[in-house]
Regions:
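Peri-catalytic and regulatory segments of divalent metal-dependent proteins
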Residues: 1-133, 139, 143-152
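Active-site metal-coordination segments of metallo-dependent hydrolases
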Residues: 9-20, 174-197
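Short, Lys/Arg-enriched charge-dense amphipathic segments
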Residues: 59-76, 143, 171-174, 233-249
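Post-HEXXH active-site segment of zinc metalloproteases
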Residues: 145-185
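Long, well-structured alpha-helical subdomains associated
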Residues: 185-186, 194-249
Length: 249
């Protein structure tokens, strides 16, 4: 690990604390701005099982205020931070005037990382963008009531409380989805992706437009840098998304 990354590296426990703080603040804001009006509640919980993932749970009765919960895995937070470190390390290690370096001429700029952030902020911003997007993805499932949609096309369940688990490509029995069930699974995942991206962009603009966050003359550069790092965060999530299980209970 190079010196720049080593200086901003966190211990696992500190990564967990940071993730809890970031998503806890978002949960608080959403409860005040959205759920309070409905008389409902959004809660955040963490799972210690060593798995890349997150899932959304809805445990409310018909006609009652929404009771939503998003569960995040600590391992997801840990690996995203480590991936962000490795990404920054890799980009700094590209030899000047090498073939890879020359590819950046296509964009008119060989700068690999935004210059408006220091080493610690680079990793931190990639991390925050990635876990925030995953959190918003799960909230997208809840807001669009994908549990109802998937349950309609999935296995039948009795009672007023839904207990089914629905995965990206598998039913709760770990049987591969096919046909209409697979179609509904794909569509709801894409819908949650859209919701997550929309919520994240709105949150990003809210922060950048805050005079206390960044001064006016620096706003464009900072916004551009944050968008760049958000895309990098999405790349850190690629493997997670391919292996992640989304439950809707």
């Amino acid at each position: 690990m190079d010196d720049a990354i080593r200086r901003c590296s966190l211990k696992d426990i500190d990564i967990y604390h940071l993730a809890s703080q970031v998503l806890g603040d978002i949960t608080h804001d959403l409860n005040e701005s959205r759920y309070a009006e409905l008389g409902g509640e959004l809660t955040l919980s963490w799972c210690t099982e060593e798995k890349f993932g997150a899932y959304a749970s809805s445990l409310d009765e018909a006609g009652k205020p929404p009771q939503h919960r998003v569960t995040m895995y600590y391992e997801l937070a840990r690996q995203v931070w480590r991936d962000a470190e490795e990404l920054c390390k890799f980009l700094r290690s590209i030899p000047q005037d090498s073939g890879v370096d020359n590819l950046y001429d296509f964009y008119g700029d060989r700068v690999k990382l935004p210059k408006c952030f220091n080493d610690g902020d680079l990793v931190n911003n990639i991390f925050v963008a990635a876990i925030t997007w995953v959190y918003f993805h799960e909230i997208g499932h809840l807001m669009q009531e994908h549990d109802v949609i998937r349950d309609e096309f999935g296995e039948g369940h009795s009672g007023t409380v839904k207990t089914s688990d629905v995965y990206d490509f598998e039913a709760s029995s770990h049987k591969r989805l096919v046909g209409r069930e697979a179609l509904v699974s794909h569509v709801t995942e894409l819908a949650a992706d859209f919701e997550a991206t929309n919520l994240y962009v709105l949150e990003l603009l809210r922060h950048v437009n805050d005079p206390g966050f960044v001064e006016g003359e620096e706003r464009t550069e900072v916004l551009s840098g944050l968008i760049y790092l958000a895309v990098a965060g999405a790349e850190c999530n690629t493997v997670i998304e391919l292996t992640q299980e989304h439950h809707i209970a």
